[in-house]
């Protein structure tokens, strides 16, 4: 089974805006000046530009500050074990290829701890 995102599966011609992907929660526990605010803003803009349907979006994260990102995205959410966000996201895609999957993680989560 191919785990590569096929554009026609998740993108449509509906004119989504970044606010369509923003959950009701407002990030308030990242440190002032933290780069995660920029990552969140960039992700919301990219999802809108690509036209990913929020009802067909899954956000997967591991442990750490970056793991909070899915809570601010209007999507299905999965908080996984440290170092397992990538494998879990792959499993989600293999089980539900009709859904778009976004993974967030930090350096420890992605490269050195738990994997």
Language-model features: locations:
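A short beta-strand-loop structural module common to alpha/beta enzyme folds
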Residues: 56-62
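Thiamine diphosphate
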Residues: 63-115
């Amino acid at each position: 089974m191919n785990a590569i995102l096929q554009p026609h599966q998740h993108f449509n011609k509906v004119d989504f805006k970044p606010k369509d992907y923003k959950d009701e929660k407002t990030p308030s526990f990242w440190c002032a000046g933290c780069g995660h605010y920029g990552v969140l803003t960039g992700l919301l803009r990219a999802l809108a530009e690509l036209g990913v349907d929020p009802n067909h979006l899954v956000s997967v994260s591991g442990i750490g500050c970056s793991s909070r990102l899915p809570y601010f995205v209007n999507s299905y959410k999965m908080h996984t074990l440290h170092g397992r966000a990538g494998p879990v996201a792959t499993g989600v895609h293999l089980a539900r290829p009709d859904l778009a999957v976004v993974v967030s993680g930090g350096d420890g989560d992605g490269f050195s701890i738990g994997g």
